[in-house]
């Protein structure tokens, strides 16, 4: 378990010891395991201390598991909850959180790092990792696909690797595996919290972790130690009873739930599973369920701590994490909901009654039981012939998945059957690949005709070069164990219908050319004319001989230190990478005379807004990737895809946006429900912003995309009355009323759009927003990154500094003072938002918890802290002022108001009097 370092303080001229601000009981509990420290173990002592503070402000409140983990990661529980009613938290209160780590995949890491590099910091402030999985094409097999992809993406991989080295980020190279499988195997831990620049980051919920998909700007928040803001989600409780049997798998649980909730049903919620049925699920099975929670719009999903989680941790060489998790759960019931905890909605599912499902096409929530799939094919006139079967993706590429698949395949091969269609299999990681190869699974799959692809995303993210004769635009059906099936997503063909199902259903159906074949009941004819029926498959949860690492060169250093002198170059002539220019700050006042660039009809996912596939290569070049903006969107007026008009002249949507940017014409987009559904890709927000888009107006947003828009300085608005969607059209002129008040911090009034039609008539459309006070600051600054950069350059990120650090100080220190982060220089004054007990005005305090110490000429980095004998840093206590605490209250009319309570908050004001190298 991690050693819990404490700040050492001594009073000048006094022998009085100052206790750490924390919970001493918790500290005592965990000292016994400190010798087995692991940097991936959550800081349980700190988390329990935060949770105990939370319970003081929410006395008697029964907490769900999700709330426990979120609240234990609050920056300041007192600031968040003092004077707040429990009923005003979920769905209303913005939480400021400190995640434990960040993970980034290679497509999104490019933009995240380009943004981080502008902040001027020498290292990431929390552990971070980069995973090269999105840029590898699935074609002929791993042995040729990996070298080809490395050659084609050398510039990007070199950039990511050098940036990782410079800033102390772990780098998992191409072929190492899919980000979420590697996170599950190495970083996920019960009760921890992480952010990932991919929408399927919630996969780690299978290990009891709060793991949330975000855009790159949110990752920059975490990497710069800026508290990450999240509106407190509501909680959907899923009560599981019974146990699965036969052909039913964990994939069928989430496919069934997607059918019930729809793609919007989880928006603004965390899905928390509980009940006796949980114990019957494997850890990787629970990860599958959490992974696809993204498909219903959920913020994340989580399971309580179980024996299968402990077994998985031990099997993946993290016994110390398992021991620490078991201990904290035993002592504090941290990793399960409190008895009597309330949920905003409860869904009961009897696992014994579940049957296999197939979801699709073109949306992951159209769920059909396998027994009724044949009828659905006839009714909807879907293709009757299967064209390919694909197994893998971050959702279903575990060891257990592979053993289930090979059992099905061996049954068919033993009966003399052969696959009727191309059959592709993707292991989730190098560890999975090496282990299934050792155990003979790979050989048996290849003997059956399977093509084993690289340990990467491949076809799931559109990086699939098909080897069959399906022509572009030809209707065809594929079966996959993937998580998402939007039009054109997998192979670029808008007529390819992807039906999502479990790996075992895919494996069985490839032995029939009939898409309607039901392996749970139907039979196939063998070459000798006999009827063959599959028996229910049997898999193995964990390898009996243990996992093996495979190629150890993929494994990065456990805790890499930054190498500041590393050169990270961007060729100005490159068409793959482009340095970022800051967006202009908002100039104030109302927006006047915007024009509607396009009014979108129907589903508009991030795949429609910023397609992947062949466009992935431009993820690091904003100007180039802007050329795919909304190319999948349907024009509501004409029914055309990727078509817009300017005074009757037709052009592509990006062409119009570039034209209007050149003309100085700001614009907006109008769309329908769940705009931005799907991937976490922030390019879908960056691109409109870069081309002078200022407002996106919809019936509703997907959570991640709405946040990404706010981060980039684009104002997301929704209709107060959805019927008003019909009152606004492409090329209408739009001005705002109410933004001036918003900029002043007035949050509770709508913004009105004054729309001037082509015939000169005027209509007013009231709109809602969900901007917080911090998000308004992003908007005013031009983007969240502009604000972070400004704070970083002033010497501190998101902490109260009364006097900013001096320009170019002789020496500075990166200090942690009672878990609050400051970059300090001699003469600075600092405010700690609590009373520092045991000291008096005039006392001198020595600061020893220093992450780095440096000057204009050098920097010393600690591991995690610099040896205190190398420097002297002292601060004198100036005063203990009190400031009124402003809290949110509700009046009878249910309007929100800010009111100053009689309660006072005491601060400790320090001045840094000495800061020198010994």
From Swiss-Prot:
Name this protein carries in UniProt: Aconitase-ribosomal protein bL21m fusion protein
Domain of life assignment: Eukaryota
Swiss-Prot/TrEMBL keywords: 4Fe-4S, Amino-acid biosynthesis, Iron, Iron-sulfur, Lyase, Lysine biosynthesis, Metal-binding, Mitochondrion, Nucleus, Transit peptide
Residues involved in [4Fe-4S] cluster binding: 394, 457, 460
Residues covered by region (Homocitrate dehydratase, mitochondrial): 31-811
Cofactor binding note of this UniProt entry: Binds 1 [4Fe-4S] cluster per subunit.
Annotated organelle transit peptide span: 1-30
Enzyme class, UniProt record, top EC level: lyase
Pathway(s) of this molecule: Amino-acid biosynthesis; L-lysine biosynthesis via AAA pathway; L-alpha-aminoadipate from 2-oxoglutarate: step 2/5
Cofactor dependency: [4Fe-4S] cluster
Functional description taken from the UniProt entry: Catalyzes the reversible dehydration of (R)-homocitrate to cis-homoaconitate, a step in the alpha-aminoadipate pathway for lysine biosynthesis.
Catalytic activity reported: (2R)-homocitrate = cis-homoaconitate + H2O
Membership in a protein family: In the N-terminal section; belongs to the aconitase/IPM isomerase family. In the C-terminal section; belongs to the bacterial ribosomal protein bL21 family.
GO molecular function annotation: 4 iron, 4 sulfur cluster binding; aconitate hydratase activity; metal ion binding; structural constituent of ribosome
Large ribosomal subunit protein bL21m: annotated segments: 812-918
């Amino acid at each position: 378990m991690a050693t819990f370092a404490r700040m050492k303080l001594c009073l000048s001229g006094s022998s009085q010891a100052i206790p750490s601000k924390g919970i001493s009981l918790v500290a005592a509990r965990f000292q016994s395991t400190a010798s087995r420290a692991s940097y991936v173990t959550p800081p349980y002592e700190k988390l329990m201390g935060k949770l105990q503070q939370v319970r003081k402000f929410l006395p008697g409140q029964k907490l769900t598991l999700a709330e426990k983990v979120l609240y234990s990661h609050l920056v300041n529980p007192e600031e968040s909850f003092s004077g707040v009613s429990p009923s005003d938290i979920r769905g209303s209160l913005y939480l400021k959180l400190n995640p434990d780590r960040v993970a980034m995949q290679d497509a999104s890491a490019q933009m995240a790092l380009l943004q981080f590099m502008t902040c001027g910091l020498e290292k990431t402030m929390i552990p971070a990792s980069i995973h090269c999985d999105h840029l590898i094409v699935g074609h002929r097999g791993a042995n040729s696909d990996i070298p080809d992809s490395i050659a084609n993406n050398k510039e990007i991989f070199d950039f990511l690797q050098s940036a990782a080295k410079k800033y102390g980020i772990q780098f998992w190279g191409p072929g190492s595996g899919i980000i979420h499988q590697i996170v599950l195997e190495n970083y996920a831990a019960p009760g921890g919290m992480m952010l990932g620049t991919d929408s399927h980051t919630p996969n780690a919920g299978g290990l009891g972790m709060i793991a949330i998909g975000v855009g790159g700007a949110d990752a920059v928040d975490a990497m710069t130690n800026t508290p990450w803001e999240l509106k407190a989600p509501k909680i959907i409780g899923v009560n599981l009873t019974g146990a699965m049997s036969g052909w039913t798998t964990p994939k069928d649980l989430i496919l069934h739930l997607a059918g019930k909730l729809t793609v919007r049903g989880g928006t603004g919620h965390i899905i928390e599973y509980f009940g006796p049925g949980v114990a019957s699920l494997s850890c990787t099975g629970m990860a599958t369920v959490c992974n696809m929670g993204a498909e219903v719009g959920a913020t994340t999903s989580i399971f309580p701590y179980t024996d299968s989680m402990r077994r998985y941790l031990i099997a993946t060489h993290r016994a110390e994490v398992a021991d620490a998790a078991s201990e904290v759960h035993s002592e504090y019931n941290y990793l399960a909901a409190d008895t009597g905890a309330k949920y905003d909605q409860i869904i009961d599912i009897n696992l014994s009654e579940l049957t296999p499902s197939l979801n699709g096409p073109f949306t992951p929530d159209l769920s059909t039981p396998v027994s009724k799939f044949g009828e659905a094919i006839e009714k909807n006139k879907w293709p009757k012939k299967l064209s390919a079967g694909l197994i893998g993706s971050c959702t279903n590429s575990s060891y257990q998945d592979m053993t289930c698949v090979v059992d099905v395949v061996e049954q068919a091969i033993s009966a003399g059957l052969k696959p009727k269609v191309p059959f592709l299999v993707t292991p989730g990681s190098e560890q999975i690949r090496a282990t299934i190869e050792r155990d003979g699974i790979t050989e048996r799959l290849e003997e059956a005709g399977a093509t084993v692809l690289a340990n990467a995303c491949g076809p799931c993210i559109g990086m699939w070069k098909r080897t069959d004769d399906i022509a572009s635009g030809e209707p065809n059906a594929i079966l996959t164990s993937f998580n998402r099936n939007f039009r054109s997503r997998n192979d670029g063909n808008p007529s390819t219908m992807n039906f999502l199902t479990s790996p075992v259903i895919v494996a069985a159906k490839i032995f029939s050319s009939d898409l309607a074949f039901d392996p749970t009941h139907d039979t196939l004819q063998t070459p000798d004319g006999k009827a063959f029926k599959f028996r229910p498959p049997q898999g193995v949860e964990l390898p009996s001989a243990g996992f093996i690492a495979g190629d150890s060169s993929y494994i990065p250093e456990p805790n890499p230190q930054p190498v500041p002198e590393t050169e990270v170059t961007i060729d100005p002539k490159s068409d793959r990478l482009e340095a970022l220019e800051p967006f202009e700050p908002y100039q104030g006042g109302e927006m006047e005379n915007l024009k509607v660039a396009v009014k979108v009809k129907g589903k508009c996912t991030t795949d429609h807004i910023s397609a992947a596939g062949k466009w992935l290569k431009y993820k690091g070049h904003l100007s180039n990737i802007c050329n795919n903006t909304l190319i999948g969107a349907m024009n509501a007026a004409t029914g055309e895809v990727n078509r817009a008009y300017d005074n009757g002249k037709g052009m592509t949507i990006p062409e119009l946006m570039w034209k209007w940017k050149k003309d100085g014409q700001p614009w907006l987009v109008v769309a329908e429900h769940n705009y931005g559904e799907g991937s976490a890709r922030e390019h879908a927000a960056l691109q409109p912003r870069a081309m002078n888009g200022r407002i996106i107006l919809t019936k509703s947003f997907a959570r991640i995309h709405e946040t990404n828009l706010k981060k980039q300085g684009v104002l997301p608005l929704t209709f107060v009355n959805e019927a008003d969607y019909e009152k606004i059209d492409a090329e209408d002129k739009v001005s705002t009323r109410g933004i001036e008040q918003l900029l002043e911090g007035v949050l509770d009034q709508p913004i009105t759009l004054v729309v001037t039609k082509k015939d000169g008539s005027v209509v007013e459309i009231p709109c809602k927003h969900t901007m917080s006070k911090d998000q308004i600051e992003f908007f005013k600054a031009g983007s969240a990154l502009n604000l972070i950069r400004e704070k970083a350059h002033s010497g501190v990120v998101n902490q109260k500094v009364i006097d900013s650090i001096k320009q170019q100080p002789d020496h500075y220190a990166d200090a942690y003072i009672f878990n609050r982060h400051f970059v300090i220089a001699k003469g600075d004054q600092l405010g700690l938002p609590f009373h520092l007990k045991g000291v008096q005005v005039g006392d001198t305090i020595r600061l020893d918890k220093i992450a780095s110490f440096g000057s204009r000429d050098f920097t010393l980095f600690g591991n995690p802290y610099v040896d205190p004998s190398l420097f002297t840093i002292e601060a004198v206590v100036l005063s203990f002022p009190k400031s009124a605490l402003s809290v949110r209250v509700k009046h009878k009319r249910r309007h929100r108001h800010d009111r100053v309570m009689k309660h006072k908050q005491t601060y400790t004001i320090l001045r840094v009097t000495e800061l020198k190298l010994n």
